[in-house]
Amino acid sequence: MIFKHTQTSRAELSGTKLRSLAFALLTRKEYSKSELIEKLKLYAVDENEVIQLVDELSDQHYQSDQRVAELVLSSQLRKGKGPNRIKQALKNKELDTALINDEIQDIDWLEQAYQLKVKKFGTDVETDAKLKAKQIRFLQYRGFDMDIIMKAIHRIEEE
């Protein structure tokens, strides 16, 4: 038996159906407040209703910018990204700047950069200018600041 895929046309949901859509979206993925508002605006009749609904969901902790920031941060750290790349990813989610700074300040970026350097290039401190430049470019691309990069590539493992 073939089922017809029924799709609600855009810009006609309100009330309970809009709330159901919001819950359906949030069960699949964590959205920032602004992302959820933009997504729901596509289907809603009234923009003010969307804003009110998202504020209510946030107050009831169904939606949390804090959780979104933590998830993005842990994901980016697993990928070996530095503070600048992570800040950019968090800004793309349109999160509050204070929240972004709170999330980023507790991390030992020197240790992160050093571990990434060791994983890619080993523990040896390079004296060759070309190889040193390659390490610097690698860590810069990952989003680390130059002072941290220089400390990481000159660091000698103390055992």
From Swiss-Prot:
Pfam families registered for this protein in UniProt: RecX_HTH2, RecX_HTH3
Keyword Cytoplasm: yes
Any one GO BP annotation for this protein: regulation of DNA repair
Subcellular location: Cytoplasm
Coiled-coil boundaries: none
KW Cytoplasm (keyword) present: yes
UniProt keywords, alphabetically: Cytoplasm
Cellular component terms per the entry's GO annotation: cytoplasm
PANTHER family named among the record's database cross-references: REGULATORY PROTEIN RECX FAMILY PROTEIN
Protein family according to the UniProt entry: Belongs to the RecX family.
Functional summary from the UniProt entry: Modulates RecA activity.
Protein name as catalogued: Regulatory protein RecX
Lineage: Bacteria, Pseudomonadati, Pseudomonadota, Gammaproteobacteria, Moraxellales
Gene: recX
